[in-house]
């Protein structure tokens, strides 16, 4: 498409939250490239290691997380993204739980983005593969983290009290 991506004024930091390594590349690669070209510092937050991905039985499954992480870091470098964070949840198991929300809030408070991109938390029956349960969980956990948790200094007080991470409004 030749559509131009408009970067909102004042955006200098963006956070992209997805379920799996490679979700950024399939879902938001062009947007990430436009952000980086506009001078925005982009951070990736990947909820799982993608350990259940692929259909190759010849690879030792215990090696998959390291492979998927390395692939994502290499792909990020192509865009000019150097900050890639992995939450380490098991592929196929994320829920929009308080643990996942807290971990996303932590990253948001560390990065302090003005823009957050994530996957849709809604099921799309017309495009079922886009409605992977992990994608929906990452999207819902991110939405809950965005409001109200990240801006509420009393949400996940351990982040403030133990890690010095103050509330942040995206």
Task: Outline where the language-model segments fall.
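Active-site rim/loop-helix segments in enzyme catalytic domains that contact anionic ligands
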Residues: 1-112
């Amino acid at each position: 498409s030749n559509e131009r991506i408009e970067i909102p004024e004042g955006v200098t930091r963006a956070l992209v939250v997805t379920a799996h390594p490679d979700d950024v590349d399939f879902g938001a690669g062009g947007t990430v490239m436009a952000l980086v070209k506009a001078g925005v510092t982009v951070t990736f937050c990947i909820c799982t290691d993608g350990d259940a991905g692929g259909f190759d039985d010849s690879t030792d499954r215990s090696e998959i997380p390291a492979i998927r992480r390395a692939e994502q870091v290499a792909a990020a470098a192509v865009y000019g993204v150097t900050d890639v964070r992995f939450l380490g949840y098991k592929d196929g198991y994320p829920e929009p739980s308080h643990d996942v929300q807290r971990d996303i809030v932590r990253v948001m408070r560390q990065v302090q983005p003005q823009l957050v991109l994530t996957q849709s938390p809604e099921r799309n029956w017309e495009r079922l593969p886009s409605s992977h349960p992990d994608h929906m969980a990452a999207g819902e956990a991110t939405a809950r983290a965005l409001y109200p948790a990240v801006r509420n200094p009393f949400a996940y007080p351990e982040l403030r009290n133990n890690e010095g991470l103050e509330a942040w409004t995206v």
